[in-house]
Amino acid sequence: MAQLPPRAPSAAAAAGQEWSAMAAAGEFLGFAAARRGAHRRSASDSAAFLMEAAVPMDDVIVGVGGGGEFDRLDDEQLMSMFSDVEAPAVSDGGGERGPAGEAHLMDMGDGDDGMGATSPAGAGAMAAAAAAAAADGIADPKRVKRILANRQSAQRSRVRKLQYISELERSVTTLQMEVSALSPRVAFLDHQRSLLTVGNSHLKQRIAALAQDKIFKDAHQEALKKEIERLRQVYHQQQIKATGGADIATAASMQAKHELLACEGAAMR
């Protein structure tokens, strides 16, 4: 009996394979989105993720066979999707987040095994793409150097900030010590100024009183001078009048002399 050629796949089988390929690609993109949501990203990485998430499904899925779903994704997109898994372990050097990335890759492998029951070719393509992206993320020296340079720059900035803060604290402490040392002297000088102000006010009052007394004494001296001049005129008039008796003239002269001496004594006091 002649060997018949294999039967062409039915429309239902082709539709099932296409649906399996689309489901595998959707799960891969969902895994990348979950990995990006689990870490804090910068504004540029978020924009890149949005641009990557906006890729249509028709560009990701090549054919119905399910063997080339990720051939349209370039190396940068794959490395950006899996950079959160491997890059921190390389840059930190301590492997703090490496086990977490491996666990996620293992979880993804488990999911791929579950999908392999329906689409083995799609699961194999996903595993190959994940391994290639992880290898590219590890072997990219420029990205590692950029991450290390950014972290070193941030570390230097933190060190400079701490040094500046410590210098400011030392300056504040020094100024506070100077203020504490100068405060008693300032208080003493303020007290001395208050005492000098009170003394100056007393001196001003005394100067005003002495000026008033001087005015009174000047007026009294002027009055005495006028009285002396009047007595001298009287004495000369009595000397001129010699027609009177000698006793009267002598008595008048003596009286005038006594009055003159009394006025001069009062003026001297």
UniProtKB/Swiss-Prot annotation:
GO terms for molecular function: DNA binding; DNA-binding transcription factor activity. InterPro entries: bZIP, bZIP_RF2, bZIP_sf, bZIP_transcription_regulators. Residues 140-196 form the bZIP domain. GO terms for biological process: positive regulation of DNA-templated transcription. Expressed in roots and shoots. Residues 142-161 are annotated as: Basic motif. SUPFAM superfamilies: Leucine zipper domain. Disulfide bonds: none annotated. CDD domains: bZIP_plant_RF2. Residues 168-196 are annotated as: Leucine-zipper. Induction: By white light. It is found in: Nucleus. One of its GO terms (cellular component) is nucleus. The keyword ATP-binding does not apply. Its main location: nucleus. It holds the Pfam family bZIP_1. Keywords: DNA-binding, Nucleus, Transcription, Transcription regulation. Transcription regulator. This is Basic leucine zipper 19. It comes from Oryza sativa subsp. japonica (Rice). The lineage of its organism: Eukaryota, Viridiplantae, Streptophyta, Embryophyta, Tracheophyta.
